[in-house]
Amino acid sequence: MDRRNFLRKGTMVAGLGASKALWPPPGSAARSRPDSLSLGAQASSLTASSGTVLLRDDFSKFPAGWLSSPLNQLNGAIQEVHYLSNRGVPLEPWANPFAHLDAWVVSEEDGRPYLEQHLINPKPTLMSPIFLTGDSAWSDYTVEVRVRPLSLADLVGVVFRYHTNRHYYLFALTGGHTARLAVRRPIETTFRVADWRELAANEFAYDTQHYYTLRVENEGPLIRAWVDGKKLLETRDGELTAGKVGVSANIPARFQDFAVTCPVDVKEKIDDRRDRRQSELTRLRSENPQPVVWKKFTTPGFGAGRNVRFGDLDGDGQLEMLICQNIPRVHADDFDQISCLTAVTLDGRILWQSGKPDPRNGLLTNDTPFQIHDIDGDGRSEVVLVRDFKLQILEGASGKLKRWVWMPSAPPDAVRPYELVSGDCIAFFNLSGNPGRRELLLKDRYAHFWIFNNRLEVLWRGQGQTGHFPYPYASEPGGLDKVVMGYSVWDSSGHQLWSQDRALHDHADAVIMGNFSGDPAAAPHVYACGSDEGFIMFDERGEIQKHVRIGHAQNFSVGKYRPELPGLQCMAINFWYNPGIVTLFDADANILAQEEPAHSGSPLLPVNWRGDGQVFALLSGNVREGGMLDGQLRRVVTFPDDGHPDLCCAVADVTGDARDEVILWDQERVWIYTQDRPFRDKRIYAPVRNPLYNESNYRAMLAWPQWQGL
């Protein structure tokens, strides 16, 4: 059976797509307190068979077994910056929003197929596994499903009016004795505790031996909830009035015979909204350059995941690619060590190779300590790396060793499988006042760091909650950098200016400092994606100005995503327990938009694709779930379905016209895309980017406005 027929069997669906509406602003009428009622038995006014079927599924199309591959055997963090196109059984038109959890299996009971959530939720106060379908345009529908709880310890129910995996309505049975209606709010007020607004509840005794038919009817703000034909709850709430649907459970539970229906006139309105949305996307995409292949080559045996560096290794004025393979040691990804380096041109010609390549060593879930940089200022690039407990400098053109020193002794308060530090990442700073950034910072995970000069002599060291990767901010006299790392800032001499380590309870995944307000006289701020702490903004004295708990904030970028607004905007993406949610902030950390365009992580790279001042954000190279987002979080550039790799992505100007190319690769191939049309204006946008010598899977990406005349 071909894949299209396989997906069609047992399922009818109307509409798929990314949601558009943001929750209403504070003070709006839609946010008023609901008029909640707990009701006894009443006859249903609508059956699941009435009206038009939006979707009906008995789950028979799925094969018996796990629906996702056991990603945690690989390490769920692989999806922080890698796109996995094959995550198990094809799910369409369903989706698993928590792509790092292998929560869903299918089998049969008494000859009838069922979908089962089989895990004991590891974070029940923070998230609930969801199996999702439908369209953001769906509204005024009835959703019905048969449910059999296999435990009474926690909730099982129906998700509806779904906007993101942190913003939806839930009708659930819980505790063996209660039926509950609630809305999950997108912003938490307490660390690692989901914010629920209760709408209505009623007593309902249930057990684990029977199936119960749950039904929710939506009509504008009106919500009615039924169990086995008896209406238990009714309320009015307009925070969200449309959205996707699904099932959810914090404990093992089974689901059968899922159906969504609506009146015929509602279906016509849904189709109209979807058609208008698609017409708008078609128009926007036609106005943007289309991606076309510029170059492609293979990496047989020596390819890797997102563990590469770009730089001019041989001095020819062109970028080359340095591909690193690695072998994790001791525990997960905490003590990774480099096994092979391969330098290649963008035509695929190997310049040099150091180590033994092996495709088993290509993927990673961490940073690796190597960079390309002219560390000695002689005009030629070197490769600076940690390997075999040695801090080394190699010739960029040949890979030959120029200089090395032993790594520092591992601090006594650290996890110490080795006497010497194995290294986590390398970043370059100007801490001497000499031309260029010639001092290097080397750190472990996540507590200690050392500053070396370009002769590999230790200048000073520090410790604290270092997070993943530091940021150099040039603000001192003579071009000296401040060291922004974790939730702290140091000056160039090693004095800690401020720290908020004790106030925040999860590490910083990405940090940046700058004045992004659009007012040249304004003071700079520090911004951080603080993992489960969310998105945080500090003033230059270290005081927390905004703390927005949007979930596990993983990566973010800063650029001109909204040309009509002053200053720059910050775009962040979530991962752990809230994956795929993208939030756009202004420079004051106010939320401008929030959507869930994909269900896994992304480096979320800023792309100067048009050259006219509008910056896009790259999700991934995947044909269906990837592409580029604009400042309204619309997918305005997509990639052709031409068989290209989509595991990893990077952005760089490699053709020389100031616009960015998109580099896509996996462990076997590299494809480079450029625009399908030349740039024809008198000046071109050429934003200043993070230097290539400070590359990381955990760096905040900056596209600072700058123009070039033509």
Language model segments and positions:
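Beta-propeller-forming repeat regions
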Residues: 46-100, 108, 112, 197-206, ...
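Beta-strand-rich interaction surfaces with strong enrichment in secreted/lumenal proteins
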Residues: 129-135, 200-205, 245
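N-terminal export signals
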Residues: 5-27
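Carbohydrate-binding surfaces in secreted/extracellular proteins
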Residues: 59, 145, 208-234
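Secretory/extracellular carbohydrate-interaction modules
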Residues: 119-187
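Short, aromatic/His-centered strand-loop micro-motif at the edge of beta-sheets
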Residues: 189-213
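C-terminal segment of N-terminal export signals and the immediately downstream linker at the start
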Residues: 1, 21-53
